[in-house]
Amino acid sequence: MAYPEKVGNRVRWNYGKLREVLDLPNLIEVQRNSYEWFLQEGLREVFHDISPIQDFTGNLILEFLDYTLGEPKYSVEECKERDVTYAAPLRVKVRLINKETGEVKEQEVFMGDFPLMTSKGTFIINGAERVIVSQLVRSPGVYFADQIDPSGKRLFATTMIPNRGAWLEFETDVNDHIFVRIDRTRKIPATVLIRALGYGSNALIMELFENDKFVQETLTRDNTDTEEEALVEIYKRLRPGEPPTVESARSLLNTLFFDPKRYDLAHVGRYKLQKKLKHGILYRYPNGEEGPKEWDRLLNKEVPVDREFIRELTKEDIIATFRYLLNLMQGEGIVDDIDHLGNRRLRSVGELLQNQFRIGLSRMERVVRERMTIQDVDVITPQVLINIRPVVASIKEFFGSSQLSQFMDQTNPLAELTHKRRLSALGPGGLSRERAGFEVRDVHHSHYGRMCPIETPEGPNIGLIGSLSTYARINSFGFMEAPYRKVDKENKRVTDEIVYLTADEEEDHIIAQANAPLDENGYFVEERVNARRGHDTLLVPTDRVEYMDVSPKQVFSVATSLIPFLEHDDANRALMGANMQRQAVPLLRCQAPVVGTGIEHRAAKDSGVCIVAERGGEVVRVTATEVAVRTDEGRTDTYKLLKFTRSNQGTCINQKPIVNKGDRVEEGQILADGPATEQGELALGRNILVAFMTWEGNNYEDAILISEKAVKEDFFTSIHIEEYECDARDTKLGPEEITRDIPNVGEDILKDLDERGIIRVGAEVRPGDILVGKVTPKGETELTAEERLLRAIFGEKAREVRDTSLRVPHGEAGKIVDVKVFSRENGDELPPGVNHLVRCYIAQKRKISEGDKMAGRHGNKGVVARILPEEDMPFMADGTPVQIVLNPLGVPSRMNIGQVLETHLGWAAKTLGFNVATPVFNGASEESIWETLRRAELPEDGKTVLYDGRTGEPFDNRVTVGYIYMIKLHHLVDDKIHARSTGPYSLVTQQPLGGKAQFGGQRFGEMEVWALEAYGAAYTLQEILTVKSDDVVGRVKTYEAIVKGENVPEPGVPESFKVLIKELQSLGLDVKVLAEDEKEIEIKEIEEDITETAKELGIELPEERRVSSSKEEIEEEEEVEDNSDEFDETFLEEAEDDFSLDDED
């Protein structure tokens, strides 16, 4: 039965049957640990690799000794406000040695500002919060593969993949000859390479491979006889057209594979090589085999303490690989599965940064070498030699434009957390979504406990982007490890000792599931238990079990573990549920779920949106904006709260204290709630009284019927903040000016502007209202004598300016909540040419309305179709009206029964007045739900009689009623709905632009034209194809006719017709347009057309309608596809997909 358990500030009744042996790790340690490693060791490695730099004569030597990171100039909040990067200066100690004179110069050199990670695991780049996503790539090492030839013969291939350097591949053909490819060139007999390694004669080669028959066969194809010939043969293949010499050939082979500067296996590559080939070559021992020794886990023997990994290839590696291939041909050994997580590793922030830094340093190294030769040896200093530009540029480029550096998804705390735990197989050095096949995307047995099998985007990225499982961690080689409890095989007892295993270590062990029954001393209750080994699921005797799962939720990611009754949902729907929780909008009055999974507290705490006590103590002051704690050491810690700031996605970030003055707080306790958290628990939505029934077709096809009470009482009201900015620049005609004095604008429009011309905080604004008054100098015209006189008398004031004020865009409105002003005079850093910068923040309170998308946690999504008065909603026998009505037909075909169980348990828990936790795959059973319903004195089947709110009659059948957790998603109708009368036109075709962002028109496409043709609606059709689209003159005349109330004139020639003629003329065809009487009709250019028409009509055309030739429009028209952020940006999908709720029905 359930037992009470304190999570955060709240008690939940936990229905879990298994006790937790291991607490969840910190959920963003992936990011933090990796960056910490980079600062401590990663940077040092790069400097060590590149140091010393020698000039071509070997006389000057430049060494990098040590480095320090200074203090950042601004705090995180200031960086966001000022649009600067949160970074610290990197200073490196450099020594320059002149061998001839023996002179040594040491200097500290500034190497640029290095972006720092915030405590939340993010980076602030130019004021925007960004996340570096971890990348899943193939691990360096040696891989063996096989394929069946059309003749039915099994062929083998092996590839040696370095971290950087040339690939080496062996392959066999139908006649059992073995070939080698060096760096993707044409293949040559493998014995040529063996010969070039120093085994000159056939006899030596046969002896090396114990007279193997396949080697004998291959030798018949080999037309070299000595080591020198073999080297020359390889050189001819690699450098065709260059005169081969033995020396150049030998040095080429050495630089390709045996030079650590050119060939790098990295630690992980060397480890994988030794693991596969078991040839014992792992370390280089600087002083031979002497010196103090220690036990090494990788080699399982005593080795000297003073050792380092061998980074480059050795001859032994190549020969051992060749031997393994020969064994495979004999039928011994196993081929590798490249989708196994033992062969894929993670490159996290630290390593990605290290690689980028290495690129920058190697570019710098070239510059240093050049400067060493050019400059005078006596006056040279390290400072003069080093040019930091390439280093700074490569870091900037990585953070600013790498595919893996992404704008943080900040819709809600879960979205932030998931983004930091995301694993992407895309990006530089990874896969591309066009080339990725089905195998790479599929769930693999090695994902168990490492990568979530559920959470992945729908669409082209499915399976290429995943999420780290809750308990998984990443080891020093970049492999994911899952925790297991060790089983004492002697006593058949499960201990509490935790062992972390990588995917390939786990492969041969028998591992029991977390739900295997144990007694209180940790002994297995039953004789045989369910267990897995590799990809097999077995029923094994308990004495064979070696490990046991830590927890059922170790398989899933955080978002998936937040779904109660996950075990009763179909996987496809669970995927949607996990993904939609990330799109939940933080509500004004959010509630933690009545039916939770017990992980809500940890998710909220680790996401970084709450304020957590760093040290224990007593709360001495609580206000809306800060909390002060007097620590046990007597110091006072002050925590500043964020109030109504804008997130990356325009949702509202607001923190409010949940402790009182005089409270005792412990370290790690939550002091203040953030957005979408309540009492320190994640609270993405609301608990709402639901009935599963149809209602007059208003919830047909997943639509949702909701009570007006939800609108009145702000159940699903959220705050959205938009940012608008306006800058005053220097133009050729003089500086722009921010002012209240705007030409041709009345005082009533300026009523909310202050004396500077900037809107006041608290003003309510509507579309078209001025936010910042700004004037720009107009082009000078030839002045008449009188004007020159006036100019001379009154000075500059008579100059012509035009109004370029920042106005509220179409379709936006709200209250001004904040205004920030930056200017050159106050010493703010602004972009070149900008003198003033003003930012206005407009907040909107959005209640739930028809057209908003809502969802539960089980992938049950829908659109609000109707908001019904409370008195018309179906009500229960005691008069309580339900608050939301969902369609019961949405449940059976989709097989997400979890929502029904949640509804039952939610009703019982709400009635009894407590909250429950039902952890995934360890939750409440049907029996315990019935038991809880009985305790709450509710019907055991969770159904009750409902009465029609309009007639008071009971409905025919009893209806399932209960409490369900619903969330409002970031697909709001206010952001999608759009209409246009006149607006911008495309430059080439003169047709209206498309989309809400461009204030475009509705596309009347091919099929819509057919529809009108089918009805013979000729005039409607003509109007749509001419004046409403691209008949430039016609639309001006029509506009005028409508304004003056006259009849609309005949349409003219559409611009697209003129474009067609121009295209035909460009093919060299002489195209003329003839009237019925065979007279040629002259087709004018647009400008002539418009200006003539405008003259005839005597109207002054507004700027944009004359002909839009702004650069932005051209760019928008030729929509450039930009894949800089390759993560699942569901909120950027086109409106047409937004409401396709279900494809299957």
UniProtKB/Swiss-Prot annotation:
Per the UniProt record, which EC number(s) apply here?
2.7.7.6
Could you confirm whether the keyword Nucleotidyltransferase appears in this record?
A: yes
Task: Spell out the InterPro entries in the cross-references.
Answer: DNA-dir_RNA_pol_bsu_ext_1_sf, DNA-dir_RNA_pol_bsu_external_1, DNA-dir_RNA_pol_su2, DNA-dir_RNAP_su2_dom, DNA-dir_RNAP_su2_hyb_sf, RNA_pol_bsu_bac, RNA_pol_bsu_CS, RNA_pol_bsu_protrusion
* Protein family (similarity comment): Belongs to the RNA polymerase beta chain family.
Describe its partners and assembly state.
The RNAP catalytic core consists of 2 alpha, 1 beta, 1 beta' and 1 omega subunit. When a sigma factor is associated with the core the holoenzyme is formed, which can initiate transcription.
Q: Which HAMAP family match?
A: RNApol_bact_RpoB
Q: What is the protein name stated in its UniProt record?
A: DNA-directed RNA polymerase subunit beta
Source organism per entry reads Desulforamulus reducens (strain ATCC BAA-1160 / DSM 100696 / MI-1) (Desulfotomaculum reducens)
